[in-house]
């Protein structure tokens, strides 16, 4: 289990730089980026990237606008600790 932050953007023009793209972030939400770690080494060794080792990710049912994060959202980065518990165990 990997806790990550996902963003939903408006239209992103090709070739835009980091500073220009920051203003296109519309929503922020949590995502569980699942990895089947025992499959990754053999898949990467084949040179084609992830196929079976990266199944579908799970997104939070709620998204917020960046301004709702207040001081925790600075320079398009969330400045908060994300903790993952599995069945109550960190």
Task: Locate predicted features.
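Glycine-enriched loop-and-adjacent helix/strand subsegments that border the catalytic/binding cleft
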Residues: 1-90
